[in-house]
Design a protein with these regions (language model features):
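Extended, well-ordered alpha-helical scaffold segments
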Residues: 1-5, 44-57, 87-105, 160, ...
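Substrate-binding groove/exosite segments of carbohydrate-active enzymes
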Residues: 1-92, 98
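The feature captures the catalytic groove of carbohydrate-active enzymes
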Residues: 62-68, 105-186, 202
Length: 206
């Protein structure tokens, strides 16, 4: 099983870049991140680190690509550190993660609800959404071409933000950034409260 797993991963990353799939070109923040914590960080750490950094910008100071996918990178980065005990990786990952969270708090945070806007984790195509988010007369498959998608607040995406706040606190603790640990924990708690308040159906218990 180990041989098959590593062989499959190496086949999917012939140029050291872990792809979303065999026929996909280029890199994608969400897919790289999920592949990293599913197995790649443990099985092929050198290619995983390369792939994770490939989706950052500004000299590894920010996470790039679609804004609603960016913060999932935080989970993959901390998982990589846990599996490889690479403190140098974590130091730079913390910078990119903290900077990106600060940017998204300014650009994608709905203060009225205390939730982040943007499509859900897996639905990057409009086919995953119903009306009125999906506009029947709009033939584009790209989700942001449908104006209603820009202000939605999805459960999966906001759960990722909650976990990212928790992991930013963990990163701060490991790296000795004591002044920010409490702030990230408080933000995680607030995020959890708002998810339960606005995205949890008590009657359906879901």
């Amino acid at each position: 099983a180990f041989t098959l797993a590593t062989k499959t991963l190496y086949k999917n990353a012939p140029d050291s870049l872990i792809k979303a799939g065999g026929q996909y070109g280029g890199e994608w923040t969400r897919d790289v991140s999920i592949n990293a914590w599913n197995a790649a960080s443990l099985l092929i750490p050198e290619k995983t680190a390369y792939s994770l950094w490939s989706v950052t910008i500004d000299d590894r100071k920010l996470i790039g690509h679609q804004y609603w996918d960016q913060i999932i990178w935080v989970m993959a980065a901390y998982d990589f550190y846990l599996k490889n005990n690479d403190l140098n990786f974590l130091k730079q990952a913390y910078i990119a993660s903290a900077n990106t969270m600060k940017k998204l708090e300014k650009e994608a945070y709905d203060e009225k609800y205390g939730l982040f806007t943007g499509p859900s984790v897996f639905n990057d195509g409009i086919a995953g959404y119903e009306e009125p988010i999906y506009e029947p007369t709009n033939k584009s498959s790209y989700v942001l071409d449908h104006p209603g998608s820009k202000t939605i607040k999805c459960l999966s995406t906001n759960c990722i933000y909650f976990r990212a706040y928790e992991l930013l606190a963990d990163m701060a603790r490991v790296l000795g950034d004591k002044k920010n640990i409490k702030e990230y924990k408080q933000k995680a708690s607030i995020q959890k409260e708002n998810i339960r308040k606005y995205l949890y159906d008590k009657k359906q218990n879901r």
